[in-house]
A protein has these predicted regions:
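Structural/interface elements that position substrates and couple domains in central-metabolism enzymes
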Residues: 1-91
């Protein structure tokens, strides 16, 4: 992984369900993370610190948004410049 030593990855986590959201929160502890989901209402709620599915503790979610650089979007242009993409959608 020597080629990644001088790169600070920005991660896009695609799919913010029961796998994607907790994973996005965990990665945000060390990296900039943009969570992507097609459900605009869900994205709006998450940006407000509200997880109606209760997959992530509300306090941990708010800390990740306010202090750790976690953000959410439904616009694919917002994740265009990420250099790591993790897909967590139903198959």
């Amino acid at each position: 992984m020597k080629f990644m030593q001088n790169i600070c990855p920005s991660i896009s986590l695609i799919g913010l369900g029961y796998v994607g959201l907790p994973l996005a929160r965990l990665f945000s502890m060390k990296y900039k993370v943009i969570g992507f989901d097609l459900n605009e209402k869900r994205v709006e709620e998450l940006n407000g610190g509200i997880d109606t599915t209760k997959e992530v503790d509300p306090q941990l979610l708010k800390e990740a948004i306010e202090c750790q650089g976690l953000s959410f979007t439904a616009d694919s242009e917002d994740i265009r410049d990420c250099n790591v993409y993790i897909i967590a959608v139903p198959t």
